Amino acid sequence: MSEFIKTLEILGEKIELGESRTIDFNIAKLYTSTNIEIPIIIERSIHPGPTVLITAAIHGDEINGVEIVRQLISRKINKPKRGTIISIPILNVFGFLNTDRAFPDGRDLNRSFPGNRRGSLASRVAYFFTNEVLPHADYCIDFHTGGASRFNAPQVRINPGDKNLLKLAKVFNVPFSVLSKNLKKTYRTTCNKKGIPIILFEGGKSLESNSQIVNYGVRGTKRLLYYLDMLDSKFNVTNPSRDTVVIEKSRWIRAQKSGLFHLKIKCNQLVEKGAILATITDPYGKMKFNVMAPNKGYIINVNQAPIVHQGDAIFHISTKDNQPKEEEREMLNE
C-alpha cells in the first residue's frame, strides 16, 4: 500500500505530503514540432493514505469522462482528506484533439497495454503510463462511454468472481454493475494482473456531454472516496435510493434488416420477453420489421443511429438479473 510512502516520485518529480502539483507528461510532438503533453494533476493530503488514480479519455472521443474528471478537479473533490488523488482528464490527447477514438496511426490505446517503449505511439504511451504512473495506485477509476452512436446506461464493469470489486461497485452504486471478463491488452487487464482494483465506468455515448451521466460519475466517485475515508468532510454524500443491479449475463441484439431505425424504448428500461424494442423500415414505406426482446431483461445499451445495417449491434440486454422491487422498476423506467 502506498499510504506509507511520504515522498511520491512520478516522471522524475517528487511530491511530498500536503503538496499539489501538475506534471506534464511529454509524449510526442505534432508535425509542427508542437509538444503534446498529458497533464497529470496530483493532490496529496498532509495525512498518509491510499492513492486513487482517476483517468478519462483513453478513447479521445469519449467526452463524458473528461467532464466528470474536470468537475472533480473544479469542485476540489480531488483534494483528499487523507492519501493521494492522481487525476488525468485526458489520457489520449491525440485522439481528443482530433475528436477520434484512436491515435493518429489508428491504434486503440485500450488495446495497447501494458505497452512497449519502442512500439507504436499508442503502445509507448501505454508503456510509460503503466511503468511511471500506475505503480503508485492502490485503486483506479476509469471513465468511458459507448462507442459511435451506442448509448450505455450508467454501469460499472467488473470481473466475475471478484468479491472485492463487487463490493466497490456496490459502493460506487450506479444503476448497473455488469460482470464481464477482461479483454487482452486493456488497461483493466493490466490493473488486474498487478492486483490493483479498478472501477471501469461506462455511461452515455461518444462525442456527447450528458449531464445525467456526468452526475452519476461524480456521485459514484464521491461515494468511493467517502468509503476510503478520503473525501473532505465539506462534501455531502447522498444515500443511494436503491442498490446497483448486478448483471451476471447479457447478450447483444443485432439488426436482422437494414433500414431506418425507430426506437420504441429507453436505455435503462426493464422489458418483457416479446416486447417491441424498435422498428426497422425501408425509406419507401413498404417494409416494417419489429425488433423484439428475446427475453426479459434490462436494456443497458441502445444504438441511437437513425440508420442501421443488417448485423449491427442495436441493443445490449441482460439475460440473467436480480429483479427489482416495484418502486425500483418505476425509477429505472424514468
Question: Model-flagged regions — what are they?
Answer:
Residues 1-334:
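Structured catalytic-domain cores with a bias toward divalent-metal coordination
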